[in-house]
Amino acid sequence: MLRTHTCGELRATDEGKKVKLCGWVDRIRDLGGVRFIDLRDRYGETQIVCDVNSEAYSVVDELTRESVVLVEGTVRKRPEGTENPNIETGEIEVVAERIEILSLADPLPFYPGETPKEEMRLKYRYIDLRSERMKRNIILRYRISKIIRDYFDELGFLEIETPFLTRSTPEGARDFLVPSRLRPGKFYALPQSPQLFKQILMISGFDRYFQIVRCFRDEDLRADRQPEFTQVDVEMSFVDVEDVLNVSEGMVSRVFKESSGIDLKVPFDRIPYDDAMEKYGTDKPDRRYGMELRDFGYAFETTEFKVIRNVLNEGGSVKGFIVPGFASEMSRKKGEELMARMKELGLGGLIWFKLDGGITSPHLKHLEKEFRKIAETENMNEGDVCLIAAHTDRNLLNEALGTLRLEIGKEHFSHLAKGFDVLWVVDFPYFEWSEEEERFVARHHPFTMPVLETLGDDYTKVRAKAYDLVINGYEVGGGSIRIHRRDIQEKIFELLGLSEEEAQKKFGFFLEAFRYGVPPHGGIAFGLDRLVSIIAGESSIREVIAFPKTGNGVCLLTGAPAEVDERQLRELRIRIEEG
């Protein structure tokens, strides 16, 4: 080994020891007769002292920041009053006898700890990863992964690898396709999840499986998504919903406790999907901001205000929420901004009033009676604001108000966004309407067990034995009890519009396995990137991934995706069409 110790290891008890340290030159200070180097590695930082009479003193002339050096010297206590309590090695320094330059650094485009634009950070990721922030995040990710592995090992789970090169089963996002050179015209697909393989492992008798696994989705990237991501994949046999939730809560609570000393309240709260949509306008609620959505229909039963009267006559709804202490912010201009936002979200507009020395509103002339009833029924206080909207589509109304609620919360009540709001959303609808495909599709995936009492030809009434884990408004995990009977699986395919021939073509190998003894089973998958980012206090998962892609799916470090050699394309019998 070139070094005897790391840069975060030496203490006052090591005084007098001869040591060798290796690391990066963080800073250089020249005080005339003595020069100081702050030497850094991933373990910490040590102050190096170069006296004017030492061989090391002149070598400092050649050094640049971020050069890599080997230092030989002797540990001594720092003079009294010069200790640095901000670093672990702050009681000592190393008096250098020799410095060897291992690698001289050119001027860097930026230095560790600086925060240039994200594009620059991603292009020179090897520099960015030297920063304390990124080092802390990457080490936290490793520790969380280890905690997860230890937890499942203690419970008798086996970590079993599943294939990366598999077949395309296009249900949901697009697959990344990999052409086969040996089988021209045929393609592998990179897995969006190990879903079918982990179910086959249950059929194979491996009743407790987990895997920390890379997954791939070729989708139009929304904010803070990655084309490749890591999930903690879990599957168990002979279980029902309660068993999966209990094991999951044990894992998540241990991760928070052992990685960061955070105690979560167990069991986690549970909210039915319908309640989440009615109260928060989303199936990923963040309850820290309060401001639950309310049905204000009671105040408008006899209203003559034309816009709302027309909506109610068509069977529509009037809903809204109270924003506490928001009156000073709620000017006419702010009201116009919020109204414009609601129109962007698909509604006709927004009605509002505030309690500011009485009821104030641009709509007061037409709706004073209704406003007074809301203020009284909802126990509004001086300074509160009430936002109201109406629409014939209750789902659209909930979603629009839910979006507005969250935006107001993040912009004006960020001080409430502390701690961790952890909950399960349960009792999901099995199907949802896809505007793009103009048909009903499985909300989770088509291997989810339906609640059999709800299974029929009315898509809107079928419920799924599915569950999502939500932390601070982010979906961190999702899973379900799986179908283990072939007749039920075939019924789901039928409801999805998959003919027997199509089902055999896409999932024949899987359906074949159903003939040979399938245990009841279920599982869940957690997004490791998101879980780590929440614990780390980072708003973007890119901050907890060593080498992430941009929002456009580009690796700025390597330039991927890139063109390939024409010869490679010919071997694969692929021709690129322009346009």
From Swiss-Prot:
Pfam families: GAD (PF02938), tRNA-synt_2 (PF00152), tRNA_anti-codon (PF01336)
Nucleotide-binding keyword on record: yes
Database matches in Gene3D superfamilies: Bira Bifunctional Protein, Domain 2, GAD-like domain, Nucleic acid-binding proteins
UniProt keyword list: Aminoacyl-tRNA synthetase, ATP-binding, Cytoplasm, Ligase, Nucleotide-binding, Protein biosynthesis
Binding positions (L-aspartate): 171, 217, 444, 482
Catalytic reaction equation(s): tRNA(Asx) + L-aspartate + ATP = L-aspartyl-tRNA(Asx) + AMP + diphosphate
Residue ranges of the region described as Aspartate: 195-198
Single GO MF descriptor: aspartate-tRNA(Asn) ligase activity
Binding site for ATP: 217-219, 226, 475, 527-530
Family matches, as SUPFAM superfamilies: Class II aaRS and biotin synthetases (SSF55681), GAD domain-like (SSF55261), Nucleic acid-binding proteins (SSF50249)
E.C. no: 6.1.1.23
GO cellular component: cytoplasm
Compartments (UniProt record): Cytoplasm
GO biological process: aspartyl-tRNA aminoacylation
Origin superkingdom: Bacteria
Site residues, Important for tRNA non-discrimination: 81
Keyword Nucleotide-binding: yes
Enzyme class, spelled out: ligase
PROSITE patterns reported for this sequence: AA_TRNA_LIGASE_II
PANTHER family hit by this protein: ASPARTATE--TRNA LIGASE, MITOCHONDRIAL, ASPARTYL/LYSYL-TRNA SYNTHETASE
Its job: Aspartyl-tRNA synthetase with relaxed tRNA specificity since it is able to aspartylate not only its cognate tRNA(Asp) but also tRNA(Asn). Reaction proceeds in two steps: L-aspartate is first activated by ATP to form Asp-AMP and then transferred to the acceptor end of tRNA(Asp/Asn).
Family, per entry: Belongs to the class-II aminoacyl-tRNA synthetase family. Type 1 subfamily.
Subunit composition and interactions: Homodimer.
Name of the protein: Aspartate--tRNA(Asp/Asn) ligase
Species whose genome carries this gene: Thermotoga maritima (strain ATCC 43589 / DSM 3109 / JCM 10099 / NBRC 100826 / MSB8)
Lineage: Bacteria, Thermotogati, Thermotogota, Thermotogae, Thermotogales
Gene behind the chain: aspS
